[in-house]
């Protein structure tokens, strides 16, 4: 029974991490894609690395 409890707790923690993903992203955080950033930011290159930045627009 205790193994199931551990698995349950792990799945809850993992789900919480995924659910909290967009809220903990901040401006200038390193990213691999736009999904790593909040909706108002985009994953843009500043020369060396990609970071979450405001979309400069068209």
UniProtKB/Swiss-Prot annotation:
GO terms for cellular component: extracellular region. Expressed by the venom gland. This is Putative calcium channel toxin 196. Disulfide bonds join 25-38, 31-43, 37-52. Belongs to the scorpion calcin-like family. KTX subfamily. The presence of a 'disulfide through disulfide knot' structurally defines this protein as a knottin. Residues 17-26 form a propeptide. It is found in: Secreted. It comes from the Eukaryota. It comes from Lychas mucronatus. May inhibit voltage-gated potassium channels Kv1.1/KCNA1, hKv1.2/KCNA2, and Kv1.3/KCNA3. May also increase intracellular calcium release through the activation of nuclear inositol 1,4,5-trisphosphate receptors (ITPR) of cardiomyocytes, thereby causing an increase in the contraction frequency of these cells. GO terms for molecular function: calcium channel regulator activity; toxin activity. Residues 1-16 form the signal peptide. Keywords: Calcium channel impairing toxin, Disulfide bond, Ion channel impairing toxin, Knottin, Neurotoxin, Ryanodine-sensitive calcium-release channel impairing toxin, Secreted, Signal, Toxin. Its main location: secreted.
């Amino acid at each position: 029974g205790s193994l199931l409890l551990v698995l349950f707790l792990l799945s809850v923690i993992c789900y919480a991490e995924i659910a909290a993903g967009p809220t903990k992203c901040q401006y200038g955080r390193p990213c691999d894609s736009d999904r790593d950033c909040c909706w108002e930011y985009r994953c843009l290159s500043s020369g060396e690395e990609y970071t979450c930045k405001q979309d400069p627009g068209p």
